[in-house]
Amino acid sequence: MDKRVSYCFPNNDTTSNPDAAAYVCIHSNAGGGRGTSYIALGTDYEQKFIGSDFVEKSNEMGNIINQKVAAATGLSQNSPINTPYLILFNKCPVPIAYMEIGFYDSSDLSILQSSSDEIGKAIAEGVDEYLKNN
């Protein structure tokens, strides 16, 4: 289990029930791109002890947050980055949104530097909307 996933549990005790409702990982990139996106898992993703709707719920939350961040910042809203497996998702007990917000080696950098409050608020609003709907 990824150490970060243990934060979903009281006192990091993974033998307990999780006390988090959602997990959001925030990442920025480099490599010539622009905009905001999220990692989306494929529908064939399966984990022992994880609910059958984990992929659907995680992808839904990522999509909502992605829309909110793009609207709040003017960053272009990119399609999800599809992957069949990502270690951070491994054994996560709650829906997870792995966000890719902006690129440090493009004009996105000025938005990341000047709009961090807006980005944080958009992420919070996205999680809130997701939780209200689920």
Regions found by a protein language model. Name each.
Residues M1-N134:
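Active-site-proximal helix/loop segments of hydrolytic enzymes
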